[in-house]
Amino acid sequence: MNKYTFIFEVGWRDPQTGRLKPYEYRKKTQMSINDARAYARRLANTQNVLHVRFYKEMY
């Protein structure tokens, strides 16, 4: 299975004010596409997460 580098964009909501926090970016290497989808689902199920986007890094 092919391994890639993915960049995840996470949109958070501040629990106290309800306002959107600045996006957080996480870079993960050596992940398959299925692993990236599972990681994005796990992040999306975290409390106060509004959305998760992920991009495959191109060289």
Label the predicted regions.
Residues R41-Y59:
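Short, mixed-charge low-complexity intrinsically disordered segments
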Residues M1-R13, R53-F54:
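Short N-terminal "domain-start" leader segments
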Residues G18-D35:
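A short, exposed loop/beta-hairpin motif centered on an aromatic-Gly-Thr core
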Residues D14-Q16, M58:
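Solvent-exposed strand-loop boundary residues in beta-sheet-rich modules
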